[in-house]
Amino acid sequence: MSIKYPKYPNITIIGAGSYGTAIAIALSRNGHSVLLWGHNAIHIQKLQINRCNQAYLPGIAFPPSLYLEKSLSIALSTCRNLLIAVPSRVFGHVLMRLKPNLKSNTRIIIASKGLEPKTGRLLQDVAYDILGKNIPIAIISGPTFARELAMGLPTAITLASNDTILSCDLQNILHCNKNFRIYSNTDTIGIQIAGVVKNIIAIGAGISDGIGFGSNARTALITRGLVEMSRLGIAIGATLDTFMGLAGLGDLILTCTDNQSRNRRFGILLGQGFEIHHAQKNVGKIIEGFYNIKEVYMLSVKHKVDMPITEQTYQILYQNKNVHDAAHSLLERTQKEEKINGLK
């Protein structure tokens, strides 16, 4: 028997992992009719039967207005607002699958955090390249753990778009006075760079805690990590204000200090002496920072941006550098003046 979906409001979410499911639950609980699609038909069928994502968000029931769909063409057939929440390494592939079925008036909301593998391109640029320059695009990012969002706990994020009319419209659609606050921004570059670099700094902060360096060291890494994030973003065309907001400082603090963060947990295990593959297996889910650090390091070299925490973390992950040696390399750097305006 086919399911008859409501025509409005029209939000389709691509990606039935923890974050995509959490957003779907939050939006449907806040009064929207939401369609959730995932690439694994068996997984979607389980969600339909259980009315819960037991694999990622156990114990959190789906609201009645959250619909599940196995067919991509059907999921896109009534879609006006399309929110994409898939890992960055498959983002381009997913867009290629979406393209033949997209309606001409579809607006894209990118919830994925990361860069295109090997090229280091921003996901917004990947979307423009595949779907065309005229498609309306917004990016959402900020301090959001999936489980807290799905539970209805208060959450605030940033929505960025070059199109201020689109930004205002989507802000009104997604915002909920009860528990989901949306701030608008026009710096799409900054919001994307922040969402990538914060995962790398979280791995570094986790390594520090795993070694046992304590709160002083963690706070220093967060603060200097914010400088690295800002340096890279500004070199690419972002504005400093973005990194002082929810998508920058907010998400950085959350990811570096709370053990719900996969990247932080991964770093802690490395600091405790676990081999990389054992730490990955222990965390059990995709660790975006592990993959994206290659592209971030590549961008830092390309744009001649000094990112010592990123560099040392990269050497730990991909050049077999000992975690203690990496820590000493950071501490032994030449002394310098701290000047935030100049991002020294």
UniProtKB/Swiss-Prot annotation:
Catalytic residues (positions): K198
Species this chain originates from: Blochmanniella pennsylvanica (strain BPEN)
Gene Ontology biological process terms in this record: carbohydrate metabolic process; glycerol-3-phosphate biosynthetic process; glycerol-3-phosphate catabolic process; glycerophospholipid biosynthetic process
Domain of life of the organism encoding this protein: Bacteria
GO cellular component, one term: cytosol
Protein name per the record: Glycerol-3-phosphate dehydrogenase [NAD(P)+]
HAMAP family, A to Z: NAD_Glyc3P_dehydrog
One Gene Ontology MF term: glycerol-3-phosphate dehydrogenase [NAD(P)+] activity
Family: Belongs to the NAD-dependent glycerol-3-phosphate dehydrogenase family.
Keywords: Cytoplasm, Lipid biosynthesis, Lipid metabolism, NAD, NADP, Nucleotide-binding, Oxidoreductase, Phospholipid biosynthesis, Phospholipid metabolism
Coiled coil: none
Pfam families (alphabetical): NAD_Gly3P_dh_C, NAD_Gly3P_dh_N
